[in-house]
Amino acid sequence: MAQPKIPEYKANGTTDKLPETVPIMPLSDGVLFPKMIIPVVITQNEYMTLIDEVMSGNRLVALITPKSGERKSDYGPGDLSPIGTLALILKMAKPDESRIHLMLQGISRIRTKNFIKTDPYLEAAFAQITENEKKDKETEGLMSNISNVYQELVRISPAIPNELGAMAVTIDEPGSLADMVASTINSSTEEKQNILETLDVKLRLKKVTRQLNHQLEILKLGDKIQSQIKEDMDKQQKEFYLRKQLKAIREELGEKEEGNVEAEEYRTKIEEGNLPEEAYKAATRELERFSRMHPSSSEYTVSSTYLDWLTTLPWDKQTEDHLDIKKARAILDKDHFGLEKPKKRILEYLAVRKLNPDSKGPILCFLGPPGTGKTSLGRSIARALGREFIRISLGGVRDEAEIRGHRRTYVGALPGRIIQEIRKAGTNNPVFMLDEIDKVGADFKGDPSSALLEVLDPEQNFSFADHYLDVSFDLSRVMFVATANVIDTIPPALRDRMEVIGLRGYTLEEKVKIARQYLIPRQRKENGLAAKHISFSQSAIRHIISDYTREAGLRNAEREIASVCRGVAAKIAEGKKVSGAIKPEDLYEYLGPVRFTSETGENALTPGVVMGLAWTPVGGEILFIEATSMKGKRGLTLTGQLGDVMKESATAALSFIRAHARDYDIDEDFFDKYDFHIHVPSGAIPKDGPSAGVTMLTALVSLLTGRKVKKGLAMTGEITLRGKVMPVGGIKEKVIAAHRAGIKEVILPRPNKKDLEEIPAKVKSAMKFHFAEKMGDVLELALNGNGATKKKKKTPAKSKKSTKPAAKKTAARKSRK
């Protein structure tokens, strides 16, 4: 049977006349360009009917892309793009009743006008779009660039036949070149439709150039990735091959593999290490993983480090305690002067250990100012016990992992400082000092003080769990010793775990003895000096301690002594003559001018000025309280950087005086006309605490009655609104400070009488102590009863003018009564 003749059509002018209308076939997954040929498969019944009718006629259909790009079973006129392609069906095949295969060739771009019918398929009138094929220099440049880039794309892409590259060179029409390239490159249906709808040929060439360059970049990047993958695979294959060869060579030589050698070493350590059962299981389990790892694996090092920690910790290694009490006492006395209370407690611990070796060790916390020997006392404990000594500083530690360690999931994870230091000590019963425990911080990383609760609890620390080890370690044999400067910043729960032993500041006499017996010999040795080169007179040592340092301990005093020793050493090195004996007048040459001048009791000479006693972290101090009054109605003014507690004490003192004004012969109207100002000198230093209550009240009464405070008298104590004198702390430091300032008498709250036992006998014998229960007792002692005690009998006061704002009732006021 003869094949039917296929009509011939041209884009510009036709051999066969084009019809006025054409059936529409939506094409959702592609775009047909003029002069291009594409295959299409039809499965929908309505389009099968369309094909049957077209094949019996002119074989023309319009392929138009839907606007949304979505597949539908039924498209309306509004769903289609306005521009499509008029196509000729070249071939049709029907392999079965459900499918039709078509081969379509594009003829020209068309624009749909109006739709003639919509059922059973769409049919519309159309207009053929003709193109201006004229070429200028820019067009020729664009065509040349497209041709060159397309050639490179054909060379790289296996999806584009080489024949198309050759064809692109022969195409002379710019629009046809753009259409051919756009139809063959890998771009989306939307991008191709955009090219089809671009009627300006020059603009179409530019868009195709952009798509072409983009496609070329993608292919080049893919090529590069593929090359890298191939290179990596080749490298792995090469490494695998070489390792196989290395393994064969080692087997021939009778050698074991590197990983197997390390695994065997770890196995030996585990078996001989006498690990606890939990640690033994963890180590064995990790060793099985380790033995299966390749040495070049990143996990190999992580696993090896973990096994190192498990096998090198002193699980069962401990030092034997030296429980010779006499020898321990001798060591403590040799290393430290004084400190009787801590020494006594340490010797008690040794005695208990001697009688009951299984007793749980205490958690001692040495509390005191800097330089009082807290840290060195820990070393002496280790010497006395014959144990290893380790120390970590907790100052500024804010991360819980510093105590417990990091979990092994983190890169570079390690155990916490507790486990690290114990491994370094090589024993499971060292003396472990937690220095500056009062300075532990907390932030978003956790609270280290909470982690220390387990460490310092004898009921829990036998199974301390470090996050890195993930097994329990027994800390119950460790003797923990902590140090702190202040106790207020230690959390209550942590404070409850420890036995706090206070280390008070030294007296001047104690400092002189310590300097002569310990500090000067040590600095001579460190600076290479002999006793003949340098010695200090008693007065020179006193001068250094009192005028060049201001501290409870001796750290700065040792620095000053070291400065003098270095100065002498420099002279000797230069060949200069040195006198050897350092006197007070020689100190200026080495240390410069005096840095501190101590307050003395001679300063409190005017009404309204009273000498109080204060406690500081570096020891006691005398503190002057100054009171004055001026006309006004603002009430009470407080200056000198006073804290809330001191402000409340001042308010309570003023309220007490106002309530008892009659008792002390003070004009009640005076408080309505005058303001009061209480100032505590050294305004740059913050001050707080209840100890100045009696001092402030005495200063106000002294001011209002015009009476001076007794010369050489200081006081301390808290007051109530009822006038009761309450006990305060820091009595030892305060009394020592008073003695240093030349004060002979001190007023103390009666409940503090017991605290005199802590004061050195030499200081106590040089001073007179008064104990007060009520403010009346204080005022009687301080003002000698000169108008400041409660009246027993009313007597009219003399009326006389004064330049001071007298608060006594005037005769005129009395006459009105």
From Swiss-Prot:
Q: Which residues form the Lon proteolytic domain?
A: 604-785
Q: Which InterPro entries match?
A: AAA+_ATPase (IPR003593), ATPase_AAA_core (IPR003959), Lon_bac (IPR027543), Lon_bac/euk-typ (IPR004815), Lon_lid (IPR054594), Lon_proteolytic (IPR008269), Lon_Prtase (IPR027065), Lon_prtase_N (IPR003111)
Record-listed E.C. numbers: 3.4.21.53
Pfam families per the UniProt record, alphabetical: AAA, Lon_C, Lon_lid, LON_substr_bdg
Positions of the UniProt region annotated as Disordered? 784-817
GO biological process terms, alphabetically, are: cellular response to heat; protein quality control for misfolded or incompletely synthesized proteins
Query: What is its induction behaviour?
Result: By heat shock.
Query: HAMAP family this protein is in?
Result: lon_bact
Oligomer and partners? Homohexamer. Organized in a ring with a central cavity.
Spell out the protein name for this chain. Lon protease
Species: Desulfosudis oleivorans (strain DSM 6200 / JCM 39069 / Hxd3)
